[in-house]
Amino acid sequence: MMDRGECLMSMKLRPMVTRPSSDGTLFWPFREERAFASAEEYGGGGGCMWPPRSYSCSFCGREFKSAQALGGHMNVHRRDRARLKQQSLSPSSTDQATPPECDRQQQVLDVGSKVLVQEETRKPNGTKREISDVCNNNVLESSMKRYEHDNGEVKTDLSVGLLSTEFDPRKKQLINGSSSSWKRAKTDVSRFPMMLGLVIGISEINGHHEELDLELRLGADPPKVN
């Protein structure tokens, strides 16, 4: 007959037997938990873990240790797909928006050209000229021509350079009246050797003295001769 100590030892060494319950499940410990617990106990943590801690990406197949890391990685894929979709739709939208803008610019150019032709490119007889010829003629006629009406004839004179009394026949007639005034005027003109001017005017029409002078001068004005 065994003593009490031997009986306890035999009970510890006896394998544990589990009885099935009424619903067919086993009591604790479960087989999976016992298997992983024994692997951790004998393997020092080198065995498998339950539940599995590896999560793979369905797009690129990359594996992550946690579900949170996989979720962040999937967000990157979603943003990339949204960006590619937006880029694929953007060229069509710009192509659709470009023709109205071009039409508006063309309308503005057409209106501007019509206004130039109607307002600035008409001769007295009503005929039209080319825009380039009109621009050149307008610049020359408005800035570099001098009209003198003498005995019903129109004379064109362009004087750009040194302005002196010798270039103006009206002043020359006044100066020729007295030699002293001529010398004084000549001395006064010598004080202003360099003078750039543009004179546009009408001298005499039908015996009436009418003058319209538009002068563009560079330098000081010469003294007037009385």
Curated annotation (Swiss-Prot):
A zinc finger (C2H2-type) spans 55-77. One of its GO terms (biological process) is response to cold. The lineage of its organism: Eukaryota, Viridiplantae, Streptophyta, Embryophyta, Tracheophyta. Keywords: Developmental protein, Differentiation, Flowering, Metal-binding, Nucleus, Repressor, Transcription, Transcription regulation, Zinc, Zinc-finger. It is found in: Nucleus. One of its GO terms (molecular function) is DNA-binding transcription factor activity. Contains a slightly degenerated ERF-associated amphiphilic repression (EAR) motif, which may be involved in the activity of transcriptional repression. GO terms for cellular component: nucleus. Strongly expressed in inflorescences and flowers, and weakly in siliques, seedlings and roots. In flowers, it is expressed in petal primordia and their precursor cells. Also expressed in the lateral root caps and the basal cells of lateral roots. It holds the Pfam family zf-C2H2_6. The keyword Thylakoid does not apply. This is Probable transcriptional regulator RABBIT EARS. Residues 85-97 have a biased composition (Polar residues). Residues 80-102 are annotated as: Disordered. The keyword Repressor applies. It comes from the Eukaryota. Its main location: nucleus. Probable transcriptional regulator essential for petal development. Required for the early development of the organ primordia of the second whorl. Acts downstream of AP1 and PTL. A motif (EAR-like (transcriptional repression)) lies at residues 212-216. It comes from Arabidopsis thaliana.
